[in-house]
C-alpha cells in the first residue's frame, strides 16, 4: 500500500462524489437520511502493510458500496448518538465486523456517529496471528462476520488507531515509529478477534435482508418510487405490510416510506448539484415526485442545509469552500 501517508479532511456541505473514497480502495455511495450537522470529517492513514480510515458524521447517513477486492476490511463504530446498522444488522458499540475481499457493505446511522476501518491483506493478518497466537484467526472467506469481543479489547483497538493518527499528523514522526504503531494495532486487532468468536445472525436476518434489497431496488427506480404505496411494496417483497415495516425498522432504523422519500431527495440534490443540469428546480422536484413545492423546499433545506435554489446558485457561480484540508503529512 505504499509509503506512510496521512490526510485529514473536513467537508462543510454534503458532497457525495468527494466521499466515494472514504474507505481505502473502495467506492462508497452516500445518501443523507435526515436533518443534522452536515460537517463530515474523514481521516485516512496508509502504510506499506495496511490502511486505516475514519469518518465522523454529524448526520444520519446511508453508505453503500464494494470494499477492497484484495484485502480484508475490519470496521467498528464505537461512538454514536443513534443506532448504527451494518448490512441490515445492528452494530453494538464494542463489535467488530470483518469483511472478506470485495464484500459489499451497507452502512446506516440514524444520527451522528464515528466509524473506523482497517484494511489489511488476509495473508499479512494471518501471518501476524500465527506469530502471536500460534494459529490463524477464524475470519470469513466470503461476505461478512461480526465479532463481539470484550469492550476493553475494542477500546485497545481504538486507542491504537487514534495513536497512529496522532503520530502520523506530527511532521517529526519517522517511518520506523509508524511501523511500530502498525504492529501495535495488529496486536490489538489479533487479540480482539481471537477472543471473540463470530456471533450468529439473529433470527429472521435473511428475510430482513431480502426485504431491504427489494425496497432499495425500488428506491433506485427513481421517480417511479413515489407511486409505490405500502400495498404495492408488500406485493413486491412477497411479505405482509407489517413484516416489511418491521424489517426496515430492524435493518435500517426507519420505515420504508421514509427510506424511499429520502432516496428521492438525494436524487434531486445530485441533479441540482450537477453543473450540466438544465432542468429548473420546480421541474426537478416534480420529476422526482415532490408535488407540494413549499413543503419540498422546507424539507430540502432541513436535510441539505441550503435551499434548492441555493444549490443551483452555488454550482453555477463561484462554489463556496466545501473541503478543508486540516492536516496532510507524508513520511518516507
Task: Give, region by region, the residue ranges found by the protein language model.
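Short, conserved glycine- and acidic-residue-centered signature motifs
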Residues: 67, 208, 261
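Short acidic (Asp/Glu) patches
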Residues: 56-61, 77-82, 99-103
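Alpha-helical bundle regulatory/interaction domains
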Residues: 1-37, 83-224, 229-241, 250-255, ...
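Generic hydrophobic, amphipathic alpha-helix propensity
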Residues: 211-215, 260-265
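Conserved short histidine dyad/triad with adjacent acidic residue
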Residues: 35-67
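Short hydrophobic/aromatic patch on the recognition helix
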Residues: 244, 248, 295-296, 300
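Short, conserved beta-strand element in jelly-roll/cupin
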Residues: 66-82, 118
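C-terminal catalytic core of tyrosine-transesterase DNA break-rejoin enzymes
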Residues: 269
Amino acid at each position: 500500500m505504499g509509503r506512510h501517508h496521512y490526510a485529514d479532511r473536513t467537508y462543510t456541505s454534503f458532497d457525495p462524489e468527494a466521499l466515494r473514497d472514504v474507505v481505502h480502495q473502495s467506492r462508497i455511495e452516500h445518501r443523507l437520511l435526515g436533518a443534522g450537522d452536515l460537517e463530515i470529517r474523514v481521516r485516512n492513514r496508509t502504510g506499506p502493510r495496511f490502511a486505516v480510515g475514519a469518518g465522523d458524521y454529524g448526520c444520519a447517513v446511508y453508505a453503500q458500496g464494494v470494499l477492497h477486492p484484495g484485502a480484508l476490511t475490519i470496521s467498528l463504530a464505537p461512538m454514536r448518538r443513534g443506532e448504527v446498522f451494518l448490512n441490515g444488522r445492528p452494530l453494538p458499540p464494542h463489535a467488530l465486523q470483518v469483511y472478506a475481499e470485495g464484500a459489499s457493505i451497507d452502512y446506516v446511522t440514524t444520527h451522528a456517529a464515528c466509524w473506523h476501518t482497517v484494511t489489511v491483506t488476509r495473508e499479512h493478518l494471518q501471518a501476524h496471528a500465527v506469530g502471536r497466537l500460534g494459529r490463524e484467526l477464524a475470519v470469513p472467506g466470503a461476505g461478512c462476520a461480526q465479532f463481539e469481543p470484550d469492550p476493553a479489547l475494542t477500546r485497545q483497538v481504538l486507542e491504537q488507531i487514534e495513536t497512529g493518527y496522532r503520530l502520523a499528523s506530527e511532521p517529526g514522526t519517522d517511518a520506523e515509529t509508524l511501523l511500530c504503531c502498525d504492529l501495535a494495532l495488529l496486536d490489538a486487532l489479533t487479540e480482539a478477534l481471537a477472543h471473540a468468536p463470530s456471533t450468529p445472525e439473529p433470527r429472521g436476518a435473511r428475510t430482513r435482508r431480502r426485504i431491504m434489497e427489494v425496497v432499495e431496488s425500488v428506491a433506485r427506480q427513481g421517480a417511479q418510487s413515489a407511486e409505490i404505496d405500502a400495498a404495492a411494496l408488500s406485493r413486491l417483497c412477497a411479505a405482509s405490510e407489517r413484516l416489511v415495516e418491521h424489517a426496515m425498522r430492524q435493518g435500517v432504523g426507519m420505515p420504508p416510506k421514509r427510506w424511499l422519500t429520502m432516496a428521492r431527495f438525494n436524487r434531486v440534490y445530485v441533479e441540482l448539484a450537477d453543473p450540466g443540469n438544465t432542468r429548473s428546480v420546480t421541474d426537478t422536484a416534480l420529476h422526482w415526485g415532490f408535488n407540494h413545492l413549499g413543503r419540498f423546499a422546507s424539507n430540502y433545506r432541513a436535510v441539505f442545509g441550503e435551499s434548492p435554489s441555493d444549490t443551483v446558485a452555488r454550482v453555477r457561480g463561484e462554489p463556496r469552500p466545501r473541503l478543508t484540508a486540516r492536516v496532510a503529512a507524508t513520511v518516507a
